Amino acid sequence: MRLSRFFLPILKENPKEAEIVSHRLMLRAGMLRQEAAGIYAWLPLGHRVLKKIEQIVREEQNRAGAIELLMPTLQLADLWRESGRYDAYGPEMLRIADRHKRELLYGPTNEEMITEIFRAYIKSYKSLPLNLYHIQWKFRDEQRPRFGVMRGREFLMKDAYSFDVDEAGARKSYNKMFVAYLRTFARMGLKAIPMRAETGPIGGDLSHEFIVLAETGESGVYIDRDVLNLPVPDENVDYDGDLTPIIKQWTSVYAATEDVHEPARYESEVPEANRLNTRGIEVGQIFYFGTKYSDSMKANVTGPDGTDAPIHGGSYGVGVSRLLGAIIEACHDDNGIIWPEAVAPFRVTILNLKQGDAATDAACDQLYRELSAKGVDVLYDDTDQRAGAKFATADLIGIPWQIHVGPRGLAEGKVELKRRSDGSRENLALADVVARLT
């Protein structure tokens, strides 16, 4: 993509309304525009990152055996009355009526609808286990939306829902999602720590939040530093095998949010040198809620003994849009964003340091063609901005690799390659650049 043809509305000054780093940098980098309190338009740069995060989430859900569908944003109020949550959910749920006076709501979550879909089609234990997921926009009418995408009113979520004939099967499904989440966040360059959590309005008796450590996080957390060094399963993990050892490895090391923190246990189990009391950002949460929804909504299957029994369920959420904020909070410096390569809007940016110079233009065009032909996402800054402004923009938007092309270097057949993550630079022969990056 040539920057001269791209829509990138960079802001030179820090927006006054931005309270935290991620919100400030997303606005300055032209990724978002606020349309109302907690509601944003996703501009092209932000949308590219959003789609890359979404694809990683999708790939890991598929790898773990979940099946994608898509449910509507609007739901019938009667479904929520059936489960008993319509009145319990509170003012965060946006309730509306259509022209026929039918009561609807803008879904904050989908346990009721997925249970209704399940009970309409699944009648026998032979169709289980089953895990269905979707990636969809949601709305919660936060009283005080703030911090950009970290606490907005409209947000993109991945929600998965598992169905099993008994508790043992449901816990196996829970373990699959636990491992899938470890892999999902690691692929995005994040160290997300699973922590025992309260179940809240979802219900059930087992839940883990996945927390990314950040000083601006909304939750206080207490961890044993050993959890930071635990290995994440690789892509060859056997989801049909016994995942219990992985779960035990991650849950046997102390890690808790302030809501469920046990000070006495923390002090007795964790050596003082290993204690870390900091803050974190929740990027996902998983729940086992047993028969909570199948009991109230009569989602039963015929078991092996011929009798009907309610299914055991779980739900598993990832804040897809929220992850952009979490990644920026964890990956930035004074100059801007530092995107991990897997989620970067572009992998490489070419900076033409003397637009209009024949040799410089030709070298940049050659690099742009050759890298693009190799499947590399390239943003080519072919604008007439001065070099200093181009450097500042490249650092702000956080592209992992910068290629600086100017007459002085080309006189020696060289260009400069800069790595955004550590600022390291190397001079390469023009002919070697493509091989270095592919």
Swiss-Prot record:
- Which Gene Ontology BP annotations are present? prolyl-tRNA aminoacylation
Q: Which InterPro entries match?
A: aa-tRNA-synt_IIb, aa-tRNA-synth_II, aa-tRNA-synth_II/BPL/LPL, Anticodon-bd, Anticodon-bd_dom_sf, Pro-tRNA-ligase_IIa, Pro-tRNA-synth_IIa_bac-type, Pro-tRNA_synthetase
The record's annotation in Pfam families points to: HGTP_anticodon (PF03129), tRNA-synt_2b (PF00587)
Q: Where in the cell is it found?
A: Cytoplasm
An example molecular function term from Gene Ontology annotations: proline-tRNA ligase activity
Show the Gene3D superfamilies listed in the entry. Answer: Anticodon-binding domain, Bira Bifunctional Protein, Domain 2
Task: Specify the domain of life of the species encoding this protein.
Answer: Bacteria
Q: What is its EC number?
A: 6.1.1.15
Principal location class: cytoplasm
The UniProt keyword set, sorted, is: Aminoacyl-tRNA synthetase, ATP-binding, Cytoplasm, Ligase, Nucleotide-binding, Protein biosynthesis
Q: Does the keyword Hydrolase apply?
A: no
Q: Where are the transmembrane segments?
A: none
Catalytic activity, as annotated: tRNA(Pro) + L-proline + ATP = L-prolyl-tRNA(Pro) + AMP + diphosphate
Q: Tell me, what does this protein do in biology?
A: Catalyzes the attachment of proline to tRNA(Pro) in a two-step reaction: proline is first activated by ATP to form Pro-AMP and then transferred to the acceptor end of tRNA(Pro).
Family listed: Belongs to the class-II aminoacyl-tRNA synthetase family. ProS type 2 subfamily.
Checking NCBIfam families in the record gives: PRK12325.1, proS_fam_II
Q: Which HAMAP family match?
A: Pro_tRNA_synth_type2
Q: Which PANTHER family match?
A: MITOCHONDRIAL RIBOSOME PROTEIN L39/PROLYL-TRNA LIGASE FAMILY MEMBER (PTHR42753), PROLINE--TRNA LIGASE (PTHR42753:SF2)
Q: What is this protein called?
A: Proline--tRNA ligase
